[in-house]
């Protein structure tokens, strides 16, 4: 099982104009994503905070897209004397009880954010030192705060072994954190640059289900993506090391697949047997570690996408049919006279 990190780039701006030239206006961009996620075209609203001289100027104001323009109420105006304004934006909008942007370096902006079902693409944007004299429109370039996940499965294939048929019923993650504190950078998140958010105090490990549906049959070498629940966004985190205890229990971050393996030509089941741990309805779980000493990826970073390619074969420890060959010698019947 491997991981591939995929990058992205930004779309064009959606610009707006207000009648009052001194009002604070916004334009919005969102980085492209390799899969279904929020984009410049699909984002519809965000929350914004603003600070002047360290004092709160806008407090969790909801900005909504209406006919390709961004509107909010009440309209805010640029401060006098060309004073700088720092803007912090989050999408989708966050309840006031959950967001505590304070414009202080190192202080979390969202505390206790919970990634409940992995379907929300959380975005953030920062605009520092904007002034009326230099800023006609606040160009808000959002970045993805979470990590995006994709899981592909395929059967093991080798010229040295008989072809396999694999049946998969479910796929889930084990022991990944679902709650944490988000801190936005104190630098402008422009289209270029690597000013990323950071996460801290990750907690509440859970085991989200990625796929649970009809049996998927793997009978060729083409990979199949599994996702029936919509879970594709995970909390950035250092993955808990994957270990197996002496009691055969797993600890740490794993992918768990409920499956069965057959010989393709004869249809004979090769794994699991009825004595396999966790055996149920002809299937059992295979475990694939996410974080070991040899793993190429041991953490999920904000704004990165990870594609896990899982190859399923006959598990290690299963009995291979070997042959020990002997040939009986011909019996000596002696000499026969005819």
Regions found by a protein language model. Give the residues of each.
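Short beta-strand elements
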Residues: 105-127, 270-313
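Short, low-hydrophobicity acidic/polar segments
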Residues: 11-178, 185-190, 194, 198, ...
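Sec-dependent N-terminal signal peptides
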Residues: 1-3
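Short, polar/proline-rich extracytoplasmic segments that appear immediately after membrane translocation
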Residues: 12-28, 40, 291-338
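C-terminal motif of bacterial Sec signal peptides marking the signal peptidase cleavage site
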Residues: 5-8
């Amino acid at each position: 099982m491997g991981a591939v990190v995929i990058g992205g780039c930004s779309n064009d701006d959606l610009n707006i104009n207000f009648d009052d030239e001194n009002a604070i206006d916004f334009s919005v961009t969102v980085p492209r994503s390799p899969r279904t996620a929020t984009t410049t075209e699909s984002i519809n609203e965000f929350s914004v905070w603003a600070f002047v001289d360290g004092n709160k100027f806008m407090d969790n104001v909801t900005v909504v897209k209406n006919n390709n323009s961004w509107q909010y109420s009440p309209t805010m105006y640029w401060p006098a004397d060309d004073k700088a304004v720092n803007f912090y934006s989050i999408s989708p909008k966050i309840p006031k009880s959950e967001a505590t942007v304070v414009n202080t370096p190192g202080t979390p902006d969202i505390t206790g954010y919970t990634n409940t079902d992995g379907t929300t693409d959380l975005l953030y944007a920062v605009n520092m030192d904007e002034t009326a004299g230099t800023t006609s429109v606040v160009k808000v370039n959002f970045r993805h705060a979470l990590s995006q996940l994709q899981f592909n499965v395929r059967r093991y294939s080798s010229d040295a072994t008989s072809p396999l048929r694999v049946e998969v019923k479910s796929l889930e993650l084990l022991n990944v954190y679902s709650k944490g504190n988000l801190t936005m950078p104190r630098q402008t998140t422009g289209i270029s640059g690597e000013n990323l958010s950071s996460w801290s105090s990750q907690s509440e490990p859970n085991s989200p289900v990625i796929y649970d549906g009809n049996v998927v049959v793997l009978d060729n070498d083409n990979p199949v993506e599994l996702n029936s629940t919509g879970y594709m966004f995970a909390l950035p985190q250092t993955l808990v090391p994957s270990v197996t205890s002496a009691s055969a229990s797993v600890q740490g971050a794993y992918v768990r697949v409920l499956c069965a393996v057959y010989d393709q030509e004869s249809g004979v089941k090769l794994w699991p047997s009825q004595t396999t741990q966790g055996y149920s309805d002809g299937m059992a779980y295979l475990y694939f570690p996410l974080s070991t000493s040899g793993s190429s990826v041991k953490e999920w970073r904000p704004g990165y996408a990870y594609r896990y390619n899982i190859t399923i074969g006959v598990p290690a420890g299963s009995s291979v049919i070997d042959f020990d060959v002997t040939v009986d010698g011909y019996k000596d019947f002696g000499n026969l006279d005819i």
